[in-house]
């Protein structure tokens, strides 16, 4: 059976997600038609410990490419763009008290928001998934010289068992 997740330089790369490579944002299409948004392992490693987050509230419509959230760490602050346009239907309230869940579990407890997509088929065409995503993320890791840390990677991989 093929692995659902790869690891490279300690960075966990789930193959079943869709990715915005340059912004290091992931998207998961859920069975109910919503899309979960989060920051990749690579993105959290580059940002450092997340200390503050702002997330658009439920009911807010987010245009393609506009921020669904913004993050702040000791060394970085920036947007989390929504490559999938739609209405925010839920946000991860846990992050307001514990924003570093993004660092600890970027693909699980550290998810940021859920969107009801306006045009999912169109928007997915601009993202990468599967082996193509793994290859492009490995290239990004090399280019930006990212190391996510082996010990933490083992914890994150358990999420996919």
UniProtKB/Swiss-Prot annotation:
Residues found modified as N6-lipoyllysine = 75
Family annotation (SUPFAM superfamilies)? Single hybrid motif (SSF51230)
Alphabetical UniProt keywords:
Lipoyl
CDD domains listed in its UniProt record: GCS_H
Co-factor(s): (R)-lipoate
Q: How is the cofactor bound?
A: Binds 1 lipoyl cofactor covalently.
Q: Does the keyword GTP-binding apply?
A: no
Instruction: Spell out the InterPro entries in the cross-references.
Output: 2-oxoA_DH_lipoyl-BS (IPR003016), Biotin_lipoyl (IPR000089), GCV_H (IPR002930), GCV_H/Fam206 (IPR033753), Single_hybrid_motif (IPR011053)
- Keyword Acetylation applies: no
Looking up Pfam families in the UniProt record yields: GCV_H (PF01597)
Sequence ranges assigned to domain Lipoyl-binding in this UniProt record: 34-116
Q: Quote the cellular component terms of the Gene Ontology held in the record.
A: cytosol; glycine cleavage complex
Which example biological process does GO assign this protein? glycine decarboxylation via glycine cleavage system
What is the annotated role of this protein in its UniProt record?
Answer: The glycine cleavage system catalyzes the degradation of glycine. The H protein shuttles the methylamine group of glycine from the P protein to the T protein.
What is stated as this protein's family in its record? Belongs to the GcvH family.
How is the subunit organization of this protein annotated in UniProt?
The glycine cleavage system is composed of four proteins: P, T, L and H.
Q: State the NCBIfam families in the record.
A: PRK01202.1
Q: What name goes with this protein?
A: Glycine cleavage system H protein 2
